[in-house]
Amino acid sequence: MISKFKFSPAVKYSSDILTIIKNFNTSGQLFGNGDRNVIKLFDIEGSKINIKAFKIPNLINKVAYRYFRKSKARRSFEYATILLEKGIGTPQPIAFLEHFNIVGLRDSYYVSEHLVTDLTYRELVEIPDYPDHDKILRQFTRFSFELHQKGIEFLDHSPGNTLIKKKEDGNYEFFLVDLNRMEFHETMTFEMRMKNLCRLTPLKEMVAVMSNEYAKLYTESEEKTFETLWKYTADFQEKFYRKKRLKKKLKFWKH
């Protein structure tokens, strides 16, 4: 078996992390439901770290990740480094590790600091009277605008992938997680920007607030911003529920 790994330059406890990953299945505190990827928390040198073990890839991807594409763990590490260089919040990247066997990629891990935050965007969708709801939503929209201005297309810009933390001055800061699908551009068109926001909420009133705030920062009118964002949102919701119904039917026919 071949192992490849890389640590952030500031990390002083690299051998401890390699030992933790070696014993990953039998140690650590499970974080989340572990449906697709398994995330565990570990205490090390007085800090809490977060290790994500990516789902073992199928045969085609095993080969692809060895010869043609970077693994999700490596992309997460590299994209986190780029985000921080561009002044965008994300938990501090610590390391990635890949194990390869004769076929291809066997398994891979991404290690980062574990951030304790107050909420994710999902709470804004599910709890309409969440304290500071309007303020957080507007500040989140400004954060998304900053991403777009810097040419960052976060392809998994969905409700659970932005952590939100209240600062001492009463404002909010935002941190992106689940980073392995990202593209970087010189500039982003209006259509690209709106499409990038369409997976966040199905609620028309939230889309209206976001459109109002985004239009203050961009060259398009509020009316055009809302019209375009709502169109992409409705399209996404329709596809999402169509796929859900299809899965339900397939499940029914299997039984």
Which residue stretches match the model-derived regions?
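Conserved ATP-binding subdomain of kinase catalytic cores across diverse folds
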Residues: 19-119, 149-150, 249
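Short acidic, glycine/proline-rich loop/turn micro-motifs
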Residues: 60-66, 122-126, 186-191
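Charged, low-complexity C-terminal accessory regions
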Residues: 139-164, 205, 216, 222-228, ...
